[in-house]
Amino acid sequence: MSGIPRSLLGQCAVALLGANARSGLTLHHAFAAYSSAAAPAQSAALIKQLRERSGAPIADVKSMLVEHGWDMDKAYEALRKKGLAAAAKKASRHAAEGLVGASFAASAASSGGSSSSEASTSGGGRGSVVVVELNSETDFVARNELFQKLLREVMGAAHALGPAAALMSARTASGPSVSEAVTALAVQVRENVRLRRAFRVDSGAGGLVFPYVHQAAAPGLGKLASVVVLAPEPDDKAQPLVLDKVVEGRLGKLLSDWCLEAQRYVLEDELTVDKLMARLKKEVGQPVRVASFLRVQCGEGLGAKAGGGDFAAEVARIVSEA
């Protein structure tokens, strides 16, 4: 600037002051409106922390921090309220994707006399199996690590409950209630997320319970889950011969379609479940029966989404409503 005459610099300064005076602004205010000087030195770190804490988009995080004077707690509360309002608007949207989770927890008697707090996504035995269905709008969200973490936490909460307890008000391992955690996830992923149903199957006295997950996206999580309880066969199981003949004749086809014992074993097509149970009887030296079973498929009964399957249109709609 050494080459610019001082007189010209003075004229520019006077002109600028005059312009600001006419507009009702001081030079200081005009400068502050276009300056980031008010942001603290650790602004990038604050944005990162609030982004991780809230899961909100970076643009929303930064705008809320600026609006609330870079106060982390106030900005988080504002983001939370904004997210809850957005989640409430999305609550009516069709959510038939998601995952079904199944996990086993051993009973106190089978875990050395102390109640087992650790649930397992594999194995089985004397104890209980919990099956939970958590729905989302898209399969993309169902593959999200946060979605799968929440599903596991809900299963853990279900194991800790009594049969008549309310699951939605139960506490998750991370602290909030199941209801609060589901809403928080919906805010983070910006989709409708809902806990649709949950089951708990106990092995019962002398029985064994086993979970199975099909089309697994992660250990214990998939699109379909089933639970089977095996129990010793009562000694007085005497079936009239005439009933056997009726089943074998007129109802044979119906049973092969609808009865578990008549279903073909998936690993050996010529082997039915009842024949498999007979094989198990020889191996253990005791008659064994299927005491009960459960089958849960993700999205079962929800039907197709209204409006057809135009994926591009659906993505455009979600983006416009986000």
From Swiss-Prot:
Gene3D superfamilies: DNA helicase RuvA subunit, C-terminal domain (1.10.8.10), Elongation factor Ts, dimerisation domain (3.30.479.20). The keyword Protein biosynthesis applies. PROSITE patterns: EF_TS_2 (PS01127). Pfam families: EF_TS. One of its GO terms (cellular component) is mitochondrion. Its main location: mitochondrion. One of its GO terms (molecular function) is translation elongation factor activity. Keywords: Elongation factor, Mitochondrion, Protein biosynthesis. This protein may be expected to contain an N-terminal transit peptide but none has been predicted. Associates with the EF-Tu.GDP complex and induces the exchange of GDP to GTP. It remains bound to the aminoacyl-tRNA.EF-Tu.GTP complex up to the GTP hydrolysis stage on the ribosome. PANTHER family: ELONGATION FACTOR TS, ELONGATION FACTOR TS, MITOCHONDRIAL. Belongs to the EF-Ts family. This is Elongation factor Ts, mitochondrial. It comes from Chlamydomonas reinhardtii. The gene is EFTS.
